């Protein structure tokens, strides 16, 4: 996509693409002339405060979190008051980090190419200093980091405006010593800039934060905790999209397409499922605008931009392969401890207290798996949650289980005239569960009970319906599942029997939850460990609501 956009600019500054209208973009940096975007102005104002203060800092967020879009917009935002030099370390190959001499000459060459770009030259720097850098990097066989930074200091001293250096994908560097020495030079000039001219601000962008860059490159304990980038200011600017920001993007789309959508309602739905994760927001919108609209299931875009159209896009998103999900699942394989932590949150309802010094929590936060909420660690958003549930429920072991096969074989009877009979689902689950596991009660626990019901439910609704777990209700005793199927919604509470008093409170909680969803019927699946339990299914009248309860 980056190459495509570059070609368009070469052929007419984006006019050809503009003639086609703007679109939602999920590959490469976004351009407001070409793409529907959330307004970044407030974010840029906050980042500029750091630049104006002369801070060096890292913009570290998970993959596809809008970092590149932000720094490209920032470079444009700062250009009237600063000389902004924006580099991308992906343009420097691994072999060019082999030693300090090779890296220094490569960096100088890339630095000069960026400044002297014929189409977008960077002005305000002395030509004789640039020529000096060019000559030294080519002719001096001993040219290294020390000499590179002496000339860069001279360049900053003679520039017409303060110089800002931005490096995207800074953590793509692979040779530990060379990269750490580069950071050390930046640090040294920062600390001595009262007597040695230096960059006004240096911004590194990547997935890893300053401490974790050291961890990635030098995993031994001593260097992990002794980063040469310890001068960096804290970066606290919010990079996720707010519901208001999403609504602003949808207003621009609506002005072009007149779908009649409920903009605030749609923005709320998108935010509820994504928590403002930039790629997920844009991906859902793109799927609605293109794939769902062209699927033939909706007569026009007015029908697409509704809750049903939104859920259709969510279903597509949850079943597609993309680089974000591949990275997400890949990290579970790379870090077994992270996998165990995520599994415990999802299936056991374990409340994990946020501790920034705990390795797996740190990794989960860095890679975007998790967020901090009320002092605890939670999965970052609903889309990630369901994708992770699906991953754990789709292993070969899970799909070969008897309970999964029983659901697959029974699926046709649960769907009548396009409607899901949830009462029958619970009834058959009780029968199958009792038949399969009644002789293995000693091996059963709450965590397995939840997993087995989800194993049973998923093939029944797969391909047509969606589900998610209400994170606020998930704990070691209770979990609420929300199922959307062909325009109908079902609330199922999974809980462990803790006596009549607790059970009655659970019924009241479910009744209140039905109020929230404006539903008259709810479902409860109780796991009862008592020897004399009475398994089966019954209906309970709660005022004007009906509760279908199944006990296993």
Feature roles, as predicted:
Residues 456-487:
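Active-site metal-binding core of divalent-cation-utilizing nuclease and nuclease-like domains
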């Amino acid at each position: 996509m980056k190459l495509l956009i570059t070609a368009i600019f070469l052929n007419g500054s984006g006019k050809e693409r503009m003639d086609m209208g703007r679109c939602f973009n999920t590959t490469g940096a976004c351009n407001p002339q070409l793409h529907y975007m959330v307004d970044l102005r407030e974010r840029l104002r906050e980042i500029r405060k750091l630049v104006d203060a002369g801070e060096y800092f890292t913009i570290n967020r998970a993959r596809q979190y809008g970092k590149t879009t932000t720094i490209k917009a920032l470079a444009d935002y700062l250009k009237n008051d600063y000389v902004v030099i924006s580099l991308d370390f992906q343009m420097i190959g691994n072999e060019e980090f082999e030693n300090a001499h090779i890296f220094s000459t490569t960096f100088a060459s890339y630095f000069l190419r960026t400044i002297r770009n014929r189409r977008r030259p960077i002005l305000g720097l002395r030509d004789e200093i640039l020529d000096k850098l060019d000559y030294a990097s080519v002719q001096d066989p001993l040219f290294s980091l020390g000499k590179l930074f002496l000339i860069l200091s001279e360049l900053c001293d003679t520039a017409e405006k303060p110089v800002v250096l931005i490096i995207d994908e800074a953590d793509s560097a692979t040779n530990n010593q060379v990269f750490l020495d580069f950071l050390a030079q930046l640090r040294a000039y920062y600390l001595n800039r009262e007597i040695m001219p230096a960059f006004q601000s240096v911004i590194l962008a990547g997935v890893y934060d300053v401490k974790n860059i050291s961890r990635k490159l030098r995993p031994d304990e001593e260097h992990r905790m002794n980063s040469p980038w310890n001068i960096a200011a804290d970066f606290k600017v919010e990079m996720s999209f707010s519901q208001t920001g999403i609504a602003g993007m949808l207003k621009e789309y609506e002005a072009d397409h007149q779908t009649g959508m409920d903009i605030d309602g749609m923005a709320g739905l998108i935010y509820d499922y994504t928590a403002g994760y930039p790629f997920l927001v844009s991906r859902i919108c793109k799927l609605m605008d293109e794939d769902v609209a062209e699927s033939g299931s909706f007569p026009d875009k007015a029908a697409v931009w509704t809750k049903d159209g939104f859920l259709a896009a969510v279903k597509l998103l949850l079943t597609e392969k993309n680089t974000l999900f591949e990275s997400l699942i890949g990290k579970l394989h790379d870090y077994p401890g992270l996998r165990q932590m995520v599994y415990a949150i999802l299936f056991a309802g374990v409340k994990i207290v946020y501790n920034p010094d705990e390795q797996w929590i740190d990794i989960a936060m860095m890679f975007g798996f998790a967020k901090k909420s009320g002092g605890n660690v939670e999965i970052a958003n609903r889309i990630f949650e369901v994708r992770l549930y699906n991953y754990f429920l789709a292993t070969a072991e899970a799909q070969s289980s008897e309970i999964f096969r029983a659901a697959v074989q029974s699926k046709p009877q649960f769907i009548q005239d396009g409607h899901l009979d949830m009462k029958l689902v619970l009834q058959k689950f009780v029968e199958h569960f009792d038949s399969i596991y009644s002789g293995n009660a000693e091996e059963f626990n709450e965590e397995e009970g939840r997993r087995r019901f989800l194993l049973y439910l998923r093939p029944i609704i797969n391909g047509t319906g969606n589900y998610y777990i209400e994170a606020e209700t998930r704990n070691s005793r209770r979990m609420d599942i929300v199922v959307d199927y062909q325009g109908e919604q079902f609330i199922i509470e999974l809980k462990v029997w803790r006596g009549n008093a607790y059970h009655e409170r659970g019924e009241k909680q479910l009744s209140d939850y039905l109020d929230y969803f404006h539903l008259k019927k709810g479902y409860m699946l109780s796991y009862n460990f008592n020897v004399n339990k009475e398994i089966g299914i019954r209906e309970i009248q709660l005022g004007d609501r009906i509760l279908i309860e199944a006990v296993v």
